[in-house]
């Protein structure tokens, strides 16, 4: 098995390369907050020497309540993304939910994300593939790791081989997610880069009646475990005031903890990738 390398400017995304951070905020709450959070991430990752891609959503289309905050929408969101890219010289990742969003979003951001709940939607997959952008596929909570090959095949047959696979937890009964560490290793056998969404994996879906709950206090432990697998990247969301975040605050890392958190993740990644592989199948 050879590891596929996805090139994003000077950044190389692959399971055997130094990990790339995909991080930012859950949803764009305001232009000023997005700029402030992007600046913090940019400063910390530059200081630690971690390749970095800024993440935020312009629309959270799958909220628990019709009254929940969804974001500024595509038009305003893309303006904010353009300003972040220009100001901080950062590559960008965001998610799309409708086929008509794919082309205009891909003109601004570098990686477009296929949401977990939509990962089997063929029309959306084809529209995303046709943009030629790098694709981040969130593994659905209801799919086995080996079933990701079907989504990979769809993208390949639609003409796109620039694919990243993202683990974000699996359903475990009602209102709970667990992370199958061996499942991530199984996805790595595809050769495609695998990244770990360590904050969304902390969710308790529907755990707060009209919104998702979470287990922010365990953000470090879960991410440490994932990084020990030798992954292509880590996906996290942070907020300066998680308790008052407009979406997924219970899962968000407190922004002031970002540097110490990433120091540990980098140390684990560096150590694990310094080891010689051991083939225990023989």
From Swiss-Prot:
Its EC number is 2.5.1.55. The keyword Chloroplast does not apply. Gene3D superfamilies: Aldolase class I (3.20.20.70). It is found in: Cytoplasm. InterPro entries: Aldolase_TIM, DAHP1/KDSA, KDO8P_synthase. Pathway: Carbohydrate biosynthesis; 3-deoxy-D-manno-octulosonate biosynthesis; 3-deoxy-D-manno-octulosonate from D-ribulose 5-phosphate: step 2/3; Bacterial outer membrane biogenesis; lipopolysaccharide biosynthesis. One of its GO terms (cellular component) is cytosol. GO terms for biological process: keto-3-deoxy-D-manno-octulosonic acid biosynthetic process. It catalyses: D-arabinose 5-phosphate + phosphoenolpyruvate + H2O = 3-deoxy-alpha-D-manno-2-octulosonate-8-phosphate + phosphate. One of its GO terms (molecular function) is 3-deoxy-8-phosphooctulonate synthase activity. Belongs to the KdsA family. This is 2-dehydro-3-deoxyphosphooctonate aldolase. It comes from Shewanella oneidensis (strain ATCC 700550 / JCM 31522 / CIP 106686 / LMG 19005 / NCIMB 14063 / MR-1). The gene is kdsA.
């Amino acid at each position: 098995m050879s590891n596929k390398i996805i090139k994003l400017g000077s950044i190389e995304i692959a399971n055997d390369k130094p990990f790339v951070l995909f991080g930012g905020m859950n949803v764009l709450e305001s232009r000023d907050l997005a700029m402030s959070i992007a600046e913090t991430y940019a400063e910390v990752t530059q200081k630690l020497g971690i390749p970095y891609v800024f993440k935020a959503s312009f629309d959270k289309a799958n909220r628990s309540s019709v009254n929940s905050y969804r974001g500024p929408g595509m038009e305003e969101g893309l303006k904010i993304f353009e300003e972040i890219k220009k100001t901080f010289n950062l590559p960008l990742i965001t998610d799309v939910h409708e086929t008509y969003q794919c082309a205009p979003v891909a003109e601004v951001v570098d990686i477009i994300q296929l949401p977990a709940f939509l990962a089997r939607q063929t029309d959306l997959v084809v529209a995303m593939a046709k943009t030629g952008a790098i694709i981040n596929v969130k593994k659905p909570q209801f799919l086995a790791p080996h079933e990701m090959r079907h989504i990979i095949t769809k993208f390949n047959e639609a003409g796109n081989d620039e694919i990243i696979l993202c683990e974000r937890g699996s359903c475990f009964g009602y209102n709970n997610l667990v992370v199958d560490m061996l499942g991530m290793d199984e996805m790595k056998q595809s050769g495609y880069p695998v990244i770990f969404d360590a904050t969304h994996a902390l969710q308790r879906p529907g755990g707060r009646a009209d919104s998702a709950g979470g287990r922010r206090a365990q953000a470090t432990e879960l991410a440490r475990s994932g990084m020990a697998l030798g992954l292509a990247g880590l996906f996290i969301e942070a907020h300066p005031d998680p308790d008052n975040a407009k979406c997924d605050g219970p899962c968000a890392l407190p922004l002031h903890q970002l540097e110490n958190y990433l120091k540990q993740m980098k140390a684990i990644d560096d150590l694990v990738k310094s080891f010689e592989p051991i083939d225990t199948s023989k």
